[in-house]
Amino acid sequence: MYAVIKTGGKQYKVVAGEKFKVEQIPADIGSEITLDQVLALGAGETIKFGAPLVEGATVLATVVSHGRHDKVKIFKMRRRKHYQKHQGHRQNYTELQIVSING
């Protein structure tokens, strides 16, 4: 069974037991969180779509770790004007492990 969930403005296809990284969620490491924005559920040949969410469907996940992604380098330049700008950015993330999919 799989589910398509929405968190942090992005959509993820998840399966029970899978680990994946999402935008930072303010939760303690080891705590269980419930993701209730389930857009679709699938099991074999049957797929259940929500409009926009599937009624009564939830995904239970455990917070594994918090961290920061690799640095993204930004470089801006205006030719012939002696203008150069360097900038870097590291996005925070939360790593989750799916415990169960209910619905």
Swiss-Prot record:
Source organism superkingdom: Bacteria
GO cellular-component term (any): ribosome
MF term (GO), any: structural constituent of ribosome
Keyword annotations of the record: Ribonucleoprotein, Ribosomal protein, RNA-binding, rRNA-binding
PROSITE patterns: RIBOSOMAL_L21
Coiled coil: none
Any single biological process term in GO: translation
Record InterPro entries: bL21-like, bL21-like_sf, Ribosomal_bL21, Ribosomal_bL21_CS
Presence of the UniProt keyword Ribosomal protein in the record: yes
Subunit (UniProt): Part of the 50S ribosomal subunit. Contacts protein L20.
NCBIfam families, per the entry: L21
UniProt similarity note: Belongs to the bacterial ribosomal protein bL21 family.
Entry function: This protein binds to 23S rRNA in the presence of protein L20.
HAMAP family tied to this protein: Ribosomal_bL21
Protein name in the entry: Large ribosomal subunit protein bL21
Source organism (scientific name): Herminiimonas arsenicoxydans
